[in-house]
């Protein structure tokens, strides 16, 4: 694998749980991918966090260790699979001090523009150099990668789901083509969290209680990258529940078309925010989550 990114955690990247927010992990990994696009010569018309040839269709992320302000880290990348229709990329975020991985990313890109023979040749050459197998800590653990049937906004409204986000897409959430960035979809899901915490009783009018939650694993399917100004709504429910963890399902819809634009699944663990460790789900929280099981 090659190093494609090096930086440190910024204070403004910290969320209400006291650690780097998931959307910034995602954004940094996408920046690392741009290094590969540059190497391959497919970034002659740069798109922020993307390129003209490939579109991110699926992402799977494992969060292995929380990151605090000022923590230095770097990203390494390899290529898992090179096919006619898609490319699978693996990245690791590694702590500079411990040299241990703190996050693992699996990205699946699909071709949206037919590559030239030169681009194909470049990919074949670099694939031989960067071919990598996904280690056990980077593979799915609490989530299935099977495709799920789609549903409309009206179908979602008939289920045990809560409205967790609604807004129009702003310019700062878009790339230079004025289309929403993949990491902005992650941001939308993250921004919905306080509504979910309020429903489960772990946040009140005074802010956070001493109980919160942290994401251990995410899966994202991207169906459409909508343009600036698009009206989006997120419906959220619970897929499963155990003693310490639960799985959220977040469907993001285009309100105008009623079609899903992205689907996120997240394994979350209940967390004592003072001790910074996982705890069993409190009975009141478990009762609230049970009502949202799909």
Predicted segments with their positions:
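Short structured motifs
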Residues: 56-64, 74-76, 216-223, 234-235
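Hot-dog-fold acyl-thioester-processing enzymes
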Residues: 1-58, 108-217, 272-294
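HotDog/MaoC-like acyl-thioester-processing domains
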Residues: 3-5, 62-72, 76-152, 226-228, ...
